[in-house]
Amino acid sequence: SKLYDYATTVYSRKQYTQWYDTKEGGYTFASFKEKTDSLSKTLTQYGIGAGDKVAILSQSMPNWSVAFFATAAFGRISIPILPDSSENEVTNIINHSESKVIFVSKRLVGKISQEIMARMTLVIELDTFEIMKVEDEKFTCDGKTSVPTPEDIATIIYTSGTTGSAKGVVLSHRNLTSNVITCYHSCKRT
């Protein structure tokens, strides 16, 4: 959370990401923060708070990182799912992780079984952030978010399951921050 706040404040005018297949063209750190904070508020509005698990099923796209940070930077736990996972693997990961919400790209929505779709509190289409399914249209409350501590779980990454069912690897905020620091120190700066 502190790294997110630092980067989106200090580098607010710099380009965060760029792509060439849409009119938008990319995000600055400031526009990334705006989208991420707005999406986090949507999750909070539907009662998705700190410690709740949020699955992300998508191919690589700019909005993937928006969904990840709207989840992890506010105390929720991100559950990324590989886009080449089968429908059965997607079902197993969502069931095992006890995810309440799923972000899914248009391209991969067919991998979400009717059973899983019915069980989700919230299903959000990742390409546009439109709500595809909500458990109760009238359900709104202030889900409690929190500033995560270094020991809090940030994400659970599931293996590809080449030797059986996928296994979850738990990574804390400290793990992710350590990776960023290592990358920073390994790059030559001029």
Language-model segments: which ranges?
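A short N-terminal helical cap/helix-turn-helix that marks the beginning
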Residues: S1-Y16, E34
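ANL superfamily adenylate-forming
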Residues: D21, V109-P150, T177
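Conserved AMP-binding A3 loop
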Residues: G26-A30, A154-I181
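Conserved S/T- and glycine-rich ATP-binding loop of Class I adenylate-forming
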Residues: V54, T71, I102, I153, ...
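Structured binding elements
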Residues: G75
